[in-house]
């Protein structure tokens, strides 16, 4: 992952992903696009392939580093995700499957224990598997840091 932060409260982030296989792979080894990694506007694993190139890009405002362990910090962001996937079918890769999604959201660090992320994701590409673009979705992720557990 790459992040360029020209000021303490502005960041540009890129998260490239890639996979190459010279032969067909079982489904559990294929690159999957959709949901929280790349393709946030789509269902998990809506597209999968043996060969893939993907990029998740974000512009972030704010910082997720609280002033103290009891404070909170908020970061807003907008994103564009894209992925291109190919399947090896008898030695021929054929044409690429492609998806793009865009959106924005808010991340919050709550003390030194919790992180909350909420985003609105919009599918841009029409996928044959969905019969179109699909629906706009709201994604919510809550993470709790269990260790180290400190007494206050």
PLM features per residue range, with description:
Residues 1-88, 128-131, 140-145, 151-152:
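C-terminal outer-membrane beta-barrel translocator/porin domains of Gram-negative envelope proteins
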Residues 50, 93-100, 107-109, 131:
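Short amphipathic alpha-helix initiation/capping segments at coil-to-helix junctions
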Residues 52-56, 99-103, 137:
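Transmembrane beta-barrel architecture of outer-membrane proteins
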Residues 69, 85-89, 95-97, 101-103, ...:
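C-terminal soluble interaction/assembly domains
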Residues 100-123:
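A short, conserved beta-to-alpha structural element at the edge of catalytic cores
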Residues 122-136:
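Outer-membrane beta-barrel translocator/channel fold
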